């Protein structure tokens, strides 16, 4: 919106300059006096839009792996899963290398969620196998994250349980990146909004130092500033997505 306002102002400024030049040149010319007067009226009607500095705040999302990933990342062979009589995964086979960035797209959104749950060990496949490389460490963003916050922790306590470094200042540094500051740290996670919970989960992923990120619709509940920050963080991420 601000860019559009700037472009509109630029066009108005060009028009103002054009009108001023005509008025200056022909205001004393009897044959052009009516045209000059008309342009004066047009000039008076042009108003530049007031552009105020943006008050929007952007989180700082930066996923930094603690360990460089090796060549062998993930091997999936013949993975199948049936739920309530419906075949969700059918003989799925693929491999991931160290430079891969993969998006799972299909008509059944449930399929990728089930695949992720299998790959992180929350669910067993009916058939097939998968194997993570020995140098990999995974961080998972679940589509349904309600259970992650079904406790009495405050935000700082909640994130500390996932951090190897238990120093409060260290943990709050990650929360600060996600726009949690001051008294926010003692807010109970159970009362957080959807967007705040997503920012907590992204803090958890950052603090993990994982070199493989599995994200299941992470932009739900996020505002445009947070989505932009997440996109920038993923672009810079040197690991596997």
Where are these regions (language model features)?
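Extended, highly charged alpha-helical segments
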Residues: 1-60, 126-127, 162-166, 170
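ABC ATP-binding cassette signature C-motif
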Residues: 1-7, 63-241
């Amino acid at each position: 919106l601000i860019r559009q306002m700037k472009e509109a102002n630029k066009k108005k400024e060009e028009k103002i300059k054009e009108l001023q030049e005509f008025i200056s040149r022909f205001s004393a010319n009897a044959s052009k006096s009516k045209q000059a007067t008309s342009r004066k009226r047009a000039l008076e009607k042009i108003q530049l839009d007031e552009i105020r500095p943006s008050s929007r705040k952007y989180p700082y999302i930066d996923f930094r792996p603690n360990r460089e990933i090796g060549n062998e990342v993930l091997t999936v062979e013949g993975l199948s899963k049936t739920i309530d009589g419906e075949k969700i995964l059918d003989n799925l086979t693929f491999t991931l290398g160290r430079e891969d960035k993969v998006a799972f797209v299909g008509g059944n959104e449930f399929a990728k969620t089930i695949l992720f749950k299998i790959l992180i060990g929350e669910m067993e496949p009916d058939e097939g196998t998968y194997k993570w490389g020995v140098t990999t460490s995974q961080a998972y963003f679940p589509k349904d994250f309600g259970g992650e916050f079904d406790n009495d922790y405050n935000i700082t306590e909640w994130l500390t349980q996932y951090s190897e470094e238990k120093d409060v200042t260290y943990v709050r540094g990650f929360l600060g990146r996600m726009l949690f500051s001051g008294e926010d740290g003692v807010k109970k996670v159970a009362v957080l909004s959807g967007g705040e919970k997503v920012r907590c989960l992204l803090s958890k992923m950052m603090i993990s130092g994982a070199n493989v990120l599995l994200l299941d619709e992470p932009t739900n509940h996020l505002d445009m500033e947070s989505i932009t920050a997440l996109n920038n963080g993923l672009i810079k991420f040197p690991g596997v997505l």
